[in-house]
Amino acid sequence: MVRVRFAPSPTGQLHIGGARTALFNYLFAKKHNGKFILRIEDTDLERSREEWAKAIMKSLKWLGIEWDEGPDIGGEFGPYFQSQRKDIYMEYINKLLEEGKAYYCFCSQEEIEKEREIAKQNKVSYKYSKKCRNISLEEAKRRIKNGEKAAVRIKAPQDGVTVVHDIIRGDVEFSNDQLDDFIILKSDGNPTYNFVCVVDDYFMKISHVIRAEEHLSNTPKQLIIYQALNLTPPQFAHVPMILAPDRSKLSKRHGATSVEEFFENGYLKEAIVNYLLLLGWSPGEDRTIIGLDEAIEKFELEKVSKNAAIYDVNKLTWINGHYLKEIHIEDLYERMKYFYSKKGIEIERFDKEYVKSALKLVREKVKTLVEVVDASTYFFDDSYEYDQKGVEKYLTPENLNIVKSLLDELKNLEPFSAPEIESLVRKKAESLNVKAANIIHTIRVCISGRTVTPGLFEMMEVLGKKEVVKRIERTCEKFLIK
């Protein structure tokens, strides 16, 4: 049975790279009717925080990536926090010590640093000198009993190669003489990342480890641990890195990089999932838009690229604009409540159909939910500021007097619909031998304070006759010299 896992460290928000890894695991599990497990790798006790674990889970759920086993729902192979599994790890570390496949290392940090410095001076890569490798277990235990601190190192093979069979990259060879007798238990009593990964993946019956390319260098060490414990390793697949447009490492200076930030910036979960799918994988046929259900059907690890994916926020924003136009208006209404409330606008106070009509208009010209708010505040608040350039260009006495002369006709217009309003405005322009655009732009500034809005006549229909007349009258009173 296919069993995959996403194992984030709770040291910050869910990064776009982590979200992509979680998504690929989720797709693979769903495609093969398998299980998707969430495991929290909180072995870094200094940096790990429970609130970050909760934030990561919240972001995954928001994206629609649900797990079958995990910290919050439990499962057959828990606990799902690594910090709660130390007894299991110690059992296997003791097994390796007893079998002579690992050993206690009493070298202090100062001694290790000295060795590093010598290697640096000799211009060779550092490898531990192995001076504790032949200390007997009995002697080591006696020294520990007498108060000495010790780490535990694995006895790694000293020649030959370790081969990683990678579904995406093929066979990747690592020379064993470069691998060193690496530490599996630190002197403070905490097991290391590579060791706990192996034990947990085995115990949780993980069939495929799908993770980021930066973990590829950890894989030979993990294979050595599997071999020492006589355990069968899972299959590995290392997905490509995500780089910034300049091919540097993606970081804060490139803008939003966490799922939480994308949410706050008004991106839709459907758009983010769609975009993440394209970072290293393609549905084929030169397509950009693909939903989760279709992706599950088409996803294959063998078709994931080896090459780094380039993060392009403009492409994400374009995709977001597509989904924003397609989303059901009821759904959009619900999602917009949060973003309007951040601006102090409670849309529940307004007639729901009125709000939905405003949203239908505005969403055609914007790309994010934040932009929806910014482009529509005048529908819900008539205390808007007037754009200064718009005032200077359009709110001239001549233009305002023309608009003012339209008021009686607007008041009597039935139905107060976009086609009827447009017909009235254009007839007025023709009768006065003025450009219709002048009247249109003047009314726009009068009723919104802006020079750029959705179509004026549709906007007037949504605002309604009473509100339009009130705003025009107020603007004329403010800017016409009495």
Swiss-Prot record:
One of its GO terms (cellular component) is cytosol. Catalyzes the attachment of glutamate to tRNA(Glu) in a two-step reaction: glutamate is first activated by ATP to form Glu-AMP and then transferred to the acceptor end of tRNA(Glu). Monomer. Keywords: Aminoacyl-tRNA synthetase, ATP-binding, Cytoplasm, Ligase, Nucleotide-binding, Protein biosynthesis. A motif ('HIGH' region) lies at residues 8-18. CDD domains: GluRS_core (cd00808). It comes from the Bacteria. A motif ('KMSKS' region) lies at residues 249-253. GO terms for biological process: glutamyl-tRNA aminoacylation. This is Glutamate--tRNA ligase 2. It comes from Caldicellulosiruptor saccharolyticus (strain ATCC 43494 / DSM 8903 / Tp8T 6331). It is an enzyme of class 6 (ligase). It is found in: Cytoplasm. The keyword Protein biosynthesis applies. The keyword Phosphoprotein does not apply. It catalyses: tRNA(Glu) + L-glutamate + ATP = L-glutamyl-tRNA(Glu) + AMP + diphosphate. Gene3D superfamilies: 1.10.10.350, Glutamate-tRNA synthetase, class I, anticodon-binding domain 1, HUPs. Belongs to the class-I aminoacyl-tRNA synthetase family. Glutamate--tRNA ligase type 1 subfamily. Its EC number is 6.1.1.17. InterPro entries: aa-tRNA-synth_I_cd-bd (IPR045462), aa-tRNA-synth_I_codon-bd_sub2 (IPR020751), aa-tRNA-synth_I_CS (IPR001412), aa_tRNA-synth_I_cd-bd_sf (IPR008925), Glu-tRNA-ligase_bac/mito (IPR004527), Glu-tRNA-synth_I_codon-bd_sub1 (IPR020752), Glu/Gln-tRNA-synth (IPR000924), Glu/Gln-tRNA-synth_Ib_cat-dom (IPR020058). One of its GO terms (molecular function) is glutamate-tRNA ligase activity. ATP binds at residue 252. Pfam families: Anticodon_2 (PF19269), tRNA-synt_1c (PF00749).
